[in-house]
Amino acid sequence: IRNLLEENPKKYDLSKLSRLTCGGSAPPVSLMRWYFEKLGVEMIQGWGMTETNPLGTLSRKVAKRSHLNLTEEQQFDNIAKAGLLMPGLELEIVDENWHPVPHDGDSVGELLIRGPWICAEYYNDPQPEKFHDGWLVTGDVAKIDGEEYLIIADRSKDLIKSGGEWISSVDLENHIVALNGVVQAAVVAQKHPKWDE
């Protein structure tokens, strides 16, 4: 959409557009800034999946009364996160032994979600590894900060292990897309004899 708008800036009347919702994958902050600075449009992002029917979290520049006095930079820091939990749902981040990790913005683990409309099983395909004690195991690696914002680190299958370190492909892609002249980026691991990937 951005490319279309840049190529034909006067073709579309966007004077009534104030918000744009994005889903499917997290937009880079540079794209959210562009919409706000060039068009005055707030890009709202959320996190969810088919199994959450569909929305689990939502992120806005000002999502709480306490955010009214945040600087613009702090507001963009907030919308870069996956957002705050929708009412009626519960989120938890757990380690490999199913123990909850602190909601400190640093501790990373497997994202679990539950609630009255969250998928409890797959029709004719039980997949017990996708469920644990009433929680849906999302397959996302995430953390929750002190204000209860969800921050998706990566899909567990997309993490890159290099030299004993786990590297988020999403973080790398976001840094690359923030560079001038870069529109899209994809980071894919390759096998390496010394570094693993």
Predicted regions span which residues?
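AMP-binding/adenylate-forming catalytic core of the ANL superfamily
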Residues: 115, 120-121, 141-197
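Active-site glycine-centered loops adjacent to acidic/histidine catalytic or metal-binding residues
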Residues: 24, 48, 83, 140, ...
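Conserved ANL (AMP-binding/adenylate-forming) active-site segment centered on the GW(Y/F)…HTG consensus within
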Residues: 40, 73-79, 104, 116-144, ...
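Residues embedded in well-ordered beta-strands within globular domains across many folds
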Residues: 18-21, 112, 186
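Short loop/turn microsegments at loop-to-beta-strand junctions
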Residues: 88-90, 133, 138-139, 183
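Beta-strand->loop->alpha-helix junctions that form or flank phosphate-binding loops
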Residues: 44-51, 83-85, 187-190
